[in-house]
Amino acid sequence: ASLGLAQLSHEATPALAQLGFSSLFFYAMAALPYRRHGPAWAAAIGLIGLTLSGAPTLALLFGLGSAVLHFADRESVGSDTTRKSHIVQEAIAIALLSLGTTVLALSLGLLRWKVEWPEATWSEWNGFVQLLVWFTWPAWPLALWTLWRWRRQLFNRRISRHIALPAWFALMCTGATLVSPSSDRTLLLALPALSTLAAFALPTLKRQVAALID
């Protein structure tokens, strides 16, 4: 839960569909190392739905980034060459699916760049920071704490999927928010990833702090 979700969850807009489809794809990538068929269908539905609901660029970025992270995670299976081969095939399939949704968006005229670069003024950047602070509260402090406590696992030769995957989703949504005219609705898609990062902070907190949060 966050303040931003509380504000927008009652509105019947494409942003809620985008939130649902992006969450479905996020689940697919998190579950793919443990299951195959269910996450495969979830990934396809998530990316196609995200594209058709008006966010084809984010669908492409989510898909390609996830494919790279999934490919980099092949070392986690050790010497299991069969599983490594499956991971490589899955990563290629995700990348091709991402490119396929982009072709679909182009054919339907959905891929329209609506980039509005922020002005180099204090009021512009102050408004962006304020949006990040209140919209994602209370997830963002815990998410930052997670990135700090797990920084060695994040910046390591061996990928830590449980940190890198939500960090990628949150980073892409935050960057898209910066150049999007509907910034709050774009930032809405970062909430599942930020909530995931925030959850990993709880085991590192003292018992009194965790009890206070509960």
What kind of region is each of these model predictions?
Residues A1, Q7-L24:
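Multi-pass, polyprenyl lipid-linked donor-dependent membrane glycosyltransferases
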